[in-house]
């Protein structure tokens, strides 16, 4: 299952209004390379092990302390554009403008400096 987490932890870690994750069990994951981990207490009160690429620091996953379930961050996956969340969690802390984002000005590529001046 793919979901978008709007908790304040995910907002802080990602620097974005939410973080998209795919929920997987350990036997369905293959990780190549070095992953650095640390454990923290999440907003939910649960302990979560955070996994980061040991080379570049990219967020790779969060997992339960027993390692049985992983929330794999979709942003670094090659197929991330096709991984559409079917569930949103922690709606109580979602950014209030998420509901109206389609009404904003969109650019097909990065705008020029002139276009983003206040």
Q: Where are each of the predicted segments found?
A:
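A short Gly-Trp-Pro
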Residues: 1-118
């Amino acid at each position: 299952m793919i979901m978008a987490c709007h908790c304040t932890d995910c907002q802080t870690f990602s620097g974005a209004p939410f973080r998209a994750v795919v929920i997987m069990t350990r036997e369905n994951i293959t990780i190549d390379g070095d992953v650095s981990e640390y454990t923290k207490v999440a907003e939910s009160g649960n302990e979560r092990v955070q996994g980061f690429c040991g080379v570049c620091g990219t967020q790779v996953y969060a997992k339960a302390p027993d390692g049985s379930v992983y929330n794999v961050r979709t942003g670094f996956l090659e197929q991330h554009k096709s991984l559409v969340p079917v569930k949103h969690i922690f709606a109580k802390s979602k950014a209030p403008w998420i509901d109206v984002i389609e009404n904003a000005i969109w650019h097909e590529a990065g705008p020029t400096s002139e276009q983003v001046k206040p």
